[in-house]
């Protein structure tokens, strides 16, 4: 028996030595970090670019859209897809990042983007002629390593060159799906290496002859469904009225796929025409949900102070009192463990709250850019 143990130990040493030699050769050929033991990986947790809305950040789980990943936002027409993407661009720019917008639909409204907080002078915009050109431009921008977020609007408008050159009525089966599949194979590695967030906006179509289940599907084949780390389904659920006039939409966003946090969370928020997503409206909704804001009849109260009678008055009050709304947003983030509070335990959260009260200002809810990222 003892000789067998010695042989096993010797064989184990030989295998370990062979593995170390193989790993050394791999690192020599492909660079340091090409292979490692998972326990040796000291990368920080997944960083995020804030969506600009606390309800959406809570639904996404990590405080925003993940950096270095593919995100798909889809829904019916005029449901708020581009609005959500433009708010994310505005937040990235506010944190010192560089943003790009590939406008395949040729429908970007600079005035509306500016109203949402986008720095249109600094925003990189491309209006490509073909789908190949759009994805090639996106790939080159991502590989530059200088872009923090890139939005492609929309996948349905990425028309293959063969379809543009052909005659109306010609059949081009599967061209767009092949185009997306090839592009995403190339892009995903570059996105991870550069920490760029790629948001693909997509449209809905209906499958013919579906008897059971939803007939709805998205364009561009199945590749985007697989490569996306986050998929968001966005829908209008109600019209917001001021008297007889419709002033906006109540919107529901459901995270139907999430590889960085638990999926199937839902965010509801208001989109006001000409203004975008109402930050104050979401603060009121989540404030009531967490118990920080008390609602008695139609009155909203915070720490004994009345915010207003009715949601519109309370929204207006918070809009005119930025410090109070920032304080409330910070307390909600702490309560729901969003953004900088995501990984904290309860006692750490309370300690951070105490430190913050000493400094007498709320912490930045979108601190997901390192100094290196901002440069």
From Swiss-Prot:
Residues 339-375 are annotated as: Disordered. Its main location: cytoplasm. GO terms for biological process: DNA recombination; DNA repair; SOS response. InterPro entries: AAA+_ATPase, DNA_recomb/repair_RecA, DNA_recomb/repair_RecA_CS, P-loop_NTPase, RecA-like_C, RecA-like_N, RecA_ATP-bd, RecA_C_sf. Keywords: ATP-binding, Cytoplasm, DNA damage, DNA recombination, DNA repair, DNA-binding, Nucleotide-binding, SOS response. ATP binds at residues 75-82. It is found in: Cytoplasm. Residues 348-358 have a biased composition (Acidic residues). GO terms for cellular component: cytosol. One of its GO terms (molecular function) is single-stranded DNA binding. Can catalyze the hydrolysis of ATP in the presence of single-stranded DNA, the ATP-dependent uptake of single-stranded DNA by duplex DNA, and the ATP-dependent hybridization of homologous single-stranded DNAs. It interacts with LexA causing its activation and leading to its autocatalytic cleavage. Belongs to the RecA family. This is Protein RecA.
